[in-house]
Swiss-Prot record:
It comes from the Bacteria. InterPro entries: Adenylosuccin_syn_GTP-bd, Adenylosuccin_syn_Lys_AS, Adenylosuccinate_synth_dom1, Adenylosuccinate_synth_dom2, Adenylosuccinate_synth_dom3, Adenylosuccinate_synthetase, P-loop_NTPase. This is Adenylosuccinate synthetase. Its main location: cytoplasm. GO terms for biological process: 'de novo' AMP biosynthetic process; IMP metabolic process. Mg(2+) binds at residues 18, 45. One of its GO terms (cellular component) is cytoplasm. SMART domains: Adenylsucc_synt (SM00788). Its EC number is 6.3.4.4. The keyword Magnesium applies. The active site is at 18 (proton acceptor), 46 (proton donor).
Length: 458
C-alpha cells in the first residue's frame, strides 16, 4: 500500500499507557516527514528496538531514529530542559543527529525543580496521612500543568528574557516554597539526590534554579520555534505528519479513571490543541492496544489477574511481556483484554483503526478470556463507566476463547498466524466495532503485520 501526501495520522494509547506506541510511531515514520509530541512530559517512556538495539525515549518524538525526519515538541508538552538535553546527549553518543532536526515550541511550559519537589512531597504526605497514593512518577508533571492552568507558568520563550524570567521565578518560588513548608512539612522531608542541589531547609533556592535555566537557555535557543506555524506550513507543502500521543486514554485527566490519571489530555482531540494544527487536518486516528491489559500504579483495573504467582496467566503476561515501566521501572499490573474498555476509548478518540501489540506474549496460553462487558450494581453494561468509583465496582463478564501453542514471534503476514490467534483478533474487532489495521508480533520494527496502511488514501 502506497502512502499518500499531505495526510496526518494521530497515534494514541487506548488503555493505561505502555501499549507499544513507540515502535509503531517509528514504523509509521517511514511514511512521514515530521513527528509531533503534543502532551505529557518526561513521565512518558517509549521503547524502540531497531536491529536488536533498544532505545528508550521520554521527551523526543520516536521519529528521531529515522534519518531526515523532523521532530517537534508541541505547546501541549511540559518541558524539563535538563531531561531533554540528557536525552539529546544520549542519542548523539549513539550517532543520532538530533539538534538540527528538533523544534521545541516556545509556548511549552517549563518543568523546574520546585515542580518535582511538590510532586514528591505530596505523594509522601498522602502516604503519611493514610491516603492512597496517586502513583505519580514524581517528575513534576502535575505541578507544572497546574502552573500552566493558573496562568503563572514560566514557558520556553521566557528563557530569552533573563530579567523577566528571574522576576517570575522569584514569584513562583515564594508561592511554592510556602506550600512546601506550611502544608507539606518539607523541612522534615528527605528529598532524593536529584533534588538536593536545589533545596536547603526544605526550601527550593533561587540561585541554582536560575543559573541552570540560563545554561539551558543558551543550548535551547537554536531549537526554539513557532511549532504551530512550521507544522501548518509543512502540511500545506504536502508533508505527512505523525502526532505521537503519550500515556493512554484511561490516564486522560478528563476521560480516564479519575483521580488515578495523568495531568494532561491523552486523547486524540488534544493533538490539535497541543500542536496548533486544526482538527480538520487530522485524517486518521490509530489506537494502539495490547493483546492484554496492563496498568502501572494505583487505580481500578477490572480485568486484573494475579500476576505475581508463577504458573498463572497473569504471571505469564508479566514475565514473557517484560512488564516493567520504561520511565520508573515499576512492575505493571496485568490482566485480560478488556473490549468494553476499548469501546470507551474508541468513542472518545474517534478511532479509525487499531494496532494490536504484543500478540506474541499470549503464545502458549491454552485458553484466553475476553472481557465483553461488566456487571455493575446488578446491571449488565457493555461500556466502561466514567470515574474510578464505578469502575472499581465493575465485575467483568468474560468470553473464553481457545489459545494457541504455536509461536507468533516475527510473523509478518496475517494468514501465517495460528487460526486461534486470528479468531481472537476477529472477536476483538466484532466486540469493539473498530477494524484492525496493524498487528505487532515482537518489539522489533520489522515484525509487523500491515492490514490497512494509515497513510494510504481512503
Amino acid at each position: 500500500m502506497k502512502a499518500s501526501k499531505g495526510r496526518n495520522v494521530v497515534v494514541v494509547g487506548t488503555q493505561w499507557g505502555d501499549e507499544g506506541k513507540g515502535k509503531l510511531v517509528d514504523w509509521l515514520t517511514e511514511s512521514a516527514q515530521g513527528v509531533v509530541r503534543f502532551q505529557g512530559g518526561h513521565n512518558a517512556g517509549h521503547t524502540l528496538v531497531i536491529n536488536g538495539v533498544k532505545t528508550a525515549l521520554h521527551l523526543i518524538p520516536s521519529g528521531i531514529m529515522r534519518p531526515g525526519v523532523k521532530c517537534y515538541i508541541g505547546n501541549g508538552v511540559v518541558l524539563s530542559a535538563g531531561k531533554l538535553f540528557e536525552e539529546i546527549e544520549g542519542l548523539e553518543k549513539a550517532g543520532v543527529e538530533v539538534r538540527s532536526r528538533l523544534r521545541v515550541s516556545e509556548a511549552c511550559p517549563l518543568i523546574l525543580p520546585f515542580h518535582a519537589a511538590l510532586d514528591v512531597a505530596r505523594e509522601a504526605a498522602r502516604e503519611h496521612g493514610g491516603a492512597e497514593k496517586i502513583g505519580t512518577t514524581g517528575r513534576g508533571i502535575g505541578p507544572a500543568y497546574e502552573d500552566k492552568i493558573a496562568r503563572r507558568a514560566l514557558r520556553v520563550q521566557d528563557l530569552k528574557y533573563p530579567e523577566r524570567f528571574a522576576a517570575k521565578l522569584r514569584e513562583l518560588l515564594a508561592l511554592h516554597n510556602h506550600v512546601l513548608s506550611t502544608f507539606l512539612g518539607s523541612a522534615n522531608f528527605q528529598f532524593g539526590d536529584a533534588l538536593k542541589p536545589y533545596i536547603t531547609g526544605g526550601q527550593v533556592q533561587f540561585e541554582p534554579v536560575f543559573d541552570e535555566a540560563m545554561r539551558h537557555a543558551e543550548m535551547l535557543k537554536p531549537m526554539m520555534a513557532d511549532v504551530s506555524r512550521e507544522l501548518n506550513e509543512a502540511h500545506a507543502a504536502g508533508a505527512n505528519l505523525l502526532f505521537e500521543g503519550a500515556q493512554g486514554t484511561l490516564l486522560d485527566v478528563d476521560h480516564g479513571t479519575y483521580p488515578y490519571v495523568t495531568s494532561s489530555n491523552c486523547v486524540a482531540g488534544n493533538a490539535a490543541a497541543g500542536s496548533g494544527v486544526g482538527p480538520g487536518h487530522l485524517h486518521y486516528i490509530l489506537g494502539i492496544t495490547k493483546a492484554y491489559c496492563t496498568r502501572v500504579g494505583g487505580g481500578p483495573f477490572p480485568t486484573e489477574l494475579d500476576w505475581e504467582t508463577p504458573g498463572t496467566p497473569g504471571y505469564h503476561m508479566s514475565t514473557v511481556g517484560a512488564e516493567k515501566g520504561v520511565t520508573t521501572g515499576r512492575s505493571r499490573r496485568c490482566g485480560w483484554f478488556d473490549a468494553a474498555l476499548l469501546k470507551r476509548s474508541a468513542q472518545v478518540n474517534g478511532l479509525s483503526g487499531l494496532c494490536i501489540t504484543k500478540l506474541d506474549v499470549l503464545d502458549g496460553l491454552r485458553e484466553l478470556s475476553l472481557c465483553v462487558g461488566y456487571e455493575l450494581d446488578g446491571e449488565r453494561i457493555d461500556l466502561l463507566p466514567m470515574g474510578a468509583e464505578e469502575i472499581a465496582r465493575c465485575v467483568p463478564i468474560y468470553e473464553n476463547i481457545a489459545g494457541w501453542t504455536e509461536s507468533t514471534v516475527g510473523v509478518t503476514r496475517y494468514e501465517d498466524l495460528p487460526s486461534n490467534a486470528r479468531r481472537y483478533l476477529e472477536r476483538i474487532e466484532q466486540v469493539t466495532g473498530v477494524p484492525i489495521a496493524m498487528i505487532s508480533t515482537s518489539p522489533d520494527r520489522d515484525h509487523t503485520i500491515l492490514m490497512r496502511h494509515p497513510y494510504a488514501a481512503d
